[in-house]
């Protein structure tokens, strides 16, 4: 057995999740695109290190930094509940490169109806893969729920994009560039609640500070879903608001007029730069383990908690991603 102590809690993130900075550092690590370049052997090696450590066996010569690195590599590629390897584009580390490409193309090809429909469909197809790949083991998504959310979000995104596109025909060109963002925001408002409809029906687990389960709350589920929608829309704002303003200016310059083929790669690059920061920072807006005051819970659950322990004022829940 190595010298590394066995009391390091790798079930939790490395950094303090009660602070924004701690959450941001955690998500910068989780969404690191470099994890996509790791080989199957490297992923298996990290899985072995993590599983052995959880079983009480530290790999000889292993340092604490190496343990945490293995933990984050493992978390980036394997489902936390099932232990299955997640499909490559469904991993959190694929968020930046995939969204960079899709969002860049949505912002570039926004003028013609066929390309608007195509890229909104591609975006919602990618979202469906991510949502299915990162589904909760506690509240699994059925194929029917996934299909309903996918069709509804795609329809909502396309309808919003085409509706606003027709309304902006007589407005300044810059306004038209923000149509894809409005479509993405509308799709998030449809997609996420539908994907998590079971939680809205039966509630999500709420616990005391020590993690003891106290019951299920629909109110907590609504708050958690609202926080996730805000985070997802927040992620899109810098990537879909800053590049259009820059590109609207650059496209008037002779440099891009003589080289129009540079427009798409330049737009994708600008989106990627924004997403590298926006994705982890917006994931960190709200604590993963969020809280809600007991007085805001359903009357039955509130009475149940007060009967068990009248001193409990606040309960906790996992908001999801």
Curated annotation (Swiss-Prot):
GO terms for molecular function: L-serine transmembrane transporter activity; monoatomic ion transmembrane transporter activity. One of its GO terms (cellular component) is mitochondrion. Widely expressed. It catalyses: L-serine(in) = L-serine(out). The lineage of its organism: Eukaryota, Metazoa, Chordata, Craniata, Vertebrata. It is a multi-pass membrane protein. It comes from Mus musculus. This is Sideroflexin-3. NCBIfam families: mtc (TIGR00798). Keywords: Acetylation, Amino-acid transport, Membrane, Mitochondrion, One-carbon metabolism, Transmembrane, Transmembrane helix, Transport. The modification N-acetylmethionine is found at residue 1. The chain crosses the membrane at residues 146-164, 174-194, 225-245, 266-286. It is found in: Mitochondrion membrane. The keyword Transmembrane applies. Belongs to the sideroflexin family. One of its GO terms (biological process) is one-carbon metabolic process. InterPro entries: Mtc. The keyword Transmembrane applies. Mitochondrial serine transporter that mediates transport of serine into mitochondria, an important step of the one-carbon metabolism pathway. Mitochondrial serine is converted to glycine and formate, which then exits to the cytosol where it is used to generate the charged folates that serve as one-carbon donors. The gene is Sfxn3.
């Amino acid at each position: 057995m190595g010298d590394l102590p066995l009391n390091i809690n790798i079930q939790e993130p490395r950094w303090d999740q009660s602070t924004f900075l701690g959450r941001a550092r955690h998500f910068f690590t989780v969404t690191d695109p470099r994890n996509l370049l790791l080989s199957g052997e490297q992923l298996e090696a990290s899985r072995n290190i993590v599983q052995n450590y959880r079983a009480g066996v530290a790999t000889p010569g292993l340092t604490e930094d190496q343990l945490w690195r293995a933990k984050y590599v493992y978390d980036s590629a394997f489902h936390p509940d099932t232990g299955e390897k997640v499909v490559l584009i469904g991993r959190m580390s694929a968020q930046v490169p995939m969204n960079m490409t899709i969002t860049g193309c949505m912002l570039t090809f926004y003028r013609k109806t066929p390309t608007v429909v195509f890229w909104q469909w591609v975006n919602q197809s990618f979202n469906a893969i991510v949502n299915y790949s990162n589904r909760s083991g506690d509240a699994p998504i059925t194929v029917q729920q996934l299909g309903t959310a996918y069709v509804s979000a795609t329809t909502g995104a396309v309808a919003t994009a085409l509706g606003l596109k027709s309304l902006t025909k007589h407005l300044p060109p810059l306004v038209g560039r923000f149509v894809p963002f409005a479509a993405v925001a509308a799709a998030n408002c449809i997609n996420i609640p539908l994907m998590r409809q079971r939680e809205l029906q039966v509630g999500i687990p709420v616990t005391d500070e020590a993690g003891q389960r106290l019951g299920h709350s629909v109110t907590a589920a609504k708050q958690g879903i609202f926080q996730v929608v805000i985070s997802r829309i927040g992620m899109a704002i810098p990537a879909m608001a800053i590049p259009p303003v820059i590109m609207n200016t650059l496209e008037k310059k002779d440099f891009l007029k003589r080289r129009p083929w540079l427009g798409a790669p330049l737009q994708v690059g600008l989106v990627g730069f924004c997403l590298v920061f926006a994705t982890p920072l917006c994931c960190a807006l709200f604590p993963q383990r969020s809280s809600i005051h007991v007085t805001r819970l359903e009357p039955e659950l509130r009475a149940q908690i007060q009967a068990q322990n009248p001193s409990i004022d606040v309960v906790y829940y996992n908001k999801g991603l």
